[in-house]
Amino acid sequence: PYFILMKTLGLLNTSIGLIFAYSVTALPLCVWMLKGYFDTIPRELEEAARIDGCTQFQVFWKIIIPLSLPAIAVTALFSFLAAWNEFLLALTFNTSNDNYTLPVGLASFISPTKQLWGDFAALSIIAAIPIVFLFIIFQKYLINGLTAGSVKG
């Protein structure tokens, strides 16, 4: 049904189609992770801000979001990793070589007629470099965010 939907909407072999597919698959994980964290934020903080004269948007923007940065960073990183490493949807929704994603392109180095293991290994290392940089940049949020929302009370 997913392939038929993408074909009907004209989203096969397009970047927009992959963005749509990755967003739809990442959304449940993001909602589940962030809900667990938002449940741990005390309601008293929101109520105190409302008493001090903040609007609902100000409460969200100035109190909830800053407190939620670790959870948002972890959720964003997990979603990015899922899309970065995803193979099956990219292979299914892209039938031309022009729109291959990194994992599908890497898989093309190994076939029954040729095995370019050296090239495959080198490109795998190069593909890991952006992930390593992201983990270094978000390290302080990751340490706090991985356990955030796991224990309530």
Residue spans for each PLM region:
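A structural signal for multi-pass alpha-helical bundles of membrane permease subunits
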Residues: P1-G153
